[in-house]
Amino acid sequence: MCNLISAGFYKIKKSRVFWTGMVLVNIWSAFLTVQAHFNSLAETIPYTFEDGLFVIETIMILVIAIFVSLFFGTEYSDGTLRNKLIGGYTRAQIYVSQFVVNAAACLLIYFSSILVSGILGLFLMGAEGVSAMKIVVYIVAGAGMCITDAALFTFLTVSVGTKAGASVAGLLLGFSLLCGAMAVHDKLSQEEYMYIPKTEQGGDISVITEDTELMKVPNPYYVFGAKRKALEFLLDINPSGQAVQLAALELFRPGAVIIYDTALTALFCSLGVFIFKKRNLK
C-alpha cells in the first residue's frame, strides 16, 4: 500500500486542482487577515493575529469537497482504479491509500493557510495576550476537521461514482452542512437575558440616552435544557459546526470534537471500503 500512497503523492504534486486550491485559499487567508487588521484600526478594537487565523475554516469544507471530488473522481474516469486492481492490490488497499492521499493534500492546504495567516497576522497585529496552548488546540481540532471532511467526501465520491456527480453532490452537501451549522450556532449564541429600556406604561422609548434605565428580562430566544444539549451535540459533530466555532474562537469542547472526528473518520472509511468492494469498475 505504500507504493499506492507514493504514487498518489506524485499525482498530488502534478495536480492543477491541488495547486489552484492551495493558491486561492492562501490568497483568501491573507485577505481576511488584512481585513481583520483594518477592522481593528477602524473600530479601535485590540485584535490579535488569532482573530484572523481561523476565519478560513468556514470555507474549508467547500474547498475539500471540490478538491476530493475532482481529484479522486478522475481516478474513475481514466481507469486508474481498474489498473490498480489488475496490478494485484485489494480494493481495501486502494480505497484506504486514496483516503490517506486525499487527507494529506487537504492538510497541506489547511496548514499553508494557517501559516500565511499566522505570519501576516503576527506582523500586522502582534501576539499580545494570545494563548499559545489555545492556538495549538485549535490547530489540532482544525486538522481533525479537515481529515473528517476528506473521509466524508472520499466516501461520497465512491458512492456517486462519477466526477461530475460527486462535484455537484459534494458542493450541495457542503453548503447544507455549513448553513445548518450557522443556524445552530446562531441559536446557541443567544444570551440568556436581554436588557430593554424601563419606561412607564405608554412611555416613549424611541429615544435612549445614557441616563435611560435598563431592566434585565429573560430572552425568549435563548435555548436551554435538553434542547440546548442536543444542539451543542449537532454543532460539535458537524465538521462545519466545528469550523464555525473555530472561526468565532468559541470551541468550548475540543476534546469531544476530536473524539467525534475520529469516530466519523473511521465510520466513513469503513462505509467507503464496503461500498467500493461492491463497485463494478469499468
Stretches with model-predicted labels:
Residues V68-G87, R91:
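Transmembrane helix boundary and interhelical loop/hinge segments in multi-pass membrane proteins
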Residues R16-F18, R91, K163, L281:
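Membrane-helix interface/capping residues of multi-pass secondary transporters
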Residues M1-M22:
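Aromatic- and glycine-rich beta-strand/loop motifs that create alpha-glucan
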Residues G79, S97-Q98, R279:
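Structural detector for helix-capping/boundary residues
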Residues F18, N26-F71, V96-G170, L178, ...:
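Secretory targeting signals
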Residues C2, M22, I237-K282:
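Alpha-helical transmembrane segments of multi-pass membrane transporters/translocases
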